[in-house]
């Protein structure tokens, strides 16, 4: 049986969140994986470095680094601004390695254009909806089914554009969002990907 299909009461999710400070979805996933065992779920969150990470995510992050990555052959380059709360953490090797890993991720995944889905402009979302709605394979579907298919496909496309939704290239079992949360818990400060820019040799300006 797939543990992720287990129904977990919102009461237990809120209780685990209260005890650990982890995000609601992280708590729900941990409880599902632990078959509802609160102690096991809390330990899972602790091992993943997610305990208290959510509590730190609202604090201002104004320090940090601007890092760069140039891929082999010098045909792809990335600049990224990664923020934290203090210069002390900005100098930590773990923080600097995170910046480098994120830059490598952006270089490797050329469909990424935004930090998160929340950063995607509405005109881009509307364009994706129009593209999916015009596809021939859904012409004969009922309006309800068509809307459902379009919503699913657009959701998938938006995740492909978002850095935070990508599986980490060094560990496909975690997302970039999870990776950042782990470093928030490890370093004890809020961490934010502020912005990034990818450069492709010979690229046009109108990428998307």
Curated annotation (Swiss-Prot):
InterPro entries (UniProt xref): EF-Ts_dimer_sf (IPR036402), Transl_elong_EFTs/EF1B (IPR001816), Transl_elong_EFTs/EF1B_dimer (IPR014039), Transl_elong_Ts_CS (IPR018101), UBA-like_sf (IPR009060)
Record's keyword terms, sorted: Chloroplast, Elongation factor, Plastid, Protein biosynthesis
Subcellular location: Plastid, Chloroplast
Gene Ontology CC terms, in alphabetical order: chloroplast; mitochondrion
Disulfide bonds: none
Recorded superkingdom: Eukaryota
One BP term from GO: mitochondrial translational elongation
GO molecular-function terms, A-Z: translation elongation factor activity
PROSITE patterns: EF_TS_1 (PS01126), EF_TS_2 (PS01127)
Described purpose of this protein according to its UniProt entry: Associates with the EF-Tu.GDP complex and induces the exchange of GDP to GTP. It remains bound to the aminoacyl-tRNA.EF-Tu.GTP complex up to the GTP hydrolysis stage on the ribosome.
Membership in a protein family: Belongs to the EF-Ts family.
Protein name (Swiss-Prot/TrEMBL): Elongation factor Ts, chloroplastic
Organism: Gracilaria tenuistipitata var. liui
